[in-house]
Amino acid sequence: MLWILVLFALAASASETTTGTSSNSSQSTSAGTTNTTTPSTACINASNGSDLGAPQLALLAASGWTLSGLLLIFTCCLCCFWLVRKVCSCCGNSSESESKATHAYTNAAFTSSDATLPMGTTGSYTPPQDGSFPPPPR
């Protein structure tokens, strides 16, 4: 969880730095005419309508909305996987562990040789093998 916060902080500082430098250098005066471009159109003008290059892709990858989008996709995939696992119970052993605990509890009386004696009795006790549970009172 901490690395996600670190990525958000890095993305925020990177986008802050790049927008600050592009807005400062976007105003240029040549031969008495003023050409002002906004940071949103500077990237489009720099690419001349061609495919995005490595610097543009790096800037896009470092932006905050891309990281939050990836975080949203990761969260959705994780929730969907958890939901499918709960509904189908084919990938994990969540319901299997409950059934194992139940069977271990019920089978202990029939298979254990050192079963505890009922209160108030002395001597040895053998659990019934015919499936009757609990044992009849003495």
From Swiss-Prot:
Transmembrane segments: 64-84
Record carries keyword Nucleotide-binding: no
Main localization, broad class: host cell
S-S bridge residues: none
Keywords, sorted A to Z: Host membrane, Membrane, Signal, Transmembrane, Transmembrane helix
Region span, Disordered: 17-37, 113-138
Protein localization: Host membrane
Domain of life where this protein originates: Viruses
Biased composition (Polar residues): 113-129
Cleavable signal peptide: 1-15
Keyword Hydrolase recorded: no
GO cellular component terms, A-Z: host cell membrane; membrane
Topological type in the membrane: Single-pass membrane protein
Protein name: Membrane glycoprotein UL139
Source organism of the structure: Human cytomegalovirus (strain Merlin)
Lineage per the UniProt record: Viruses, Duplodnaviria, Heunggongvirae, Peploviricota, Herviviricetes
Underlying gene: UL139
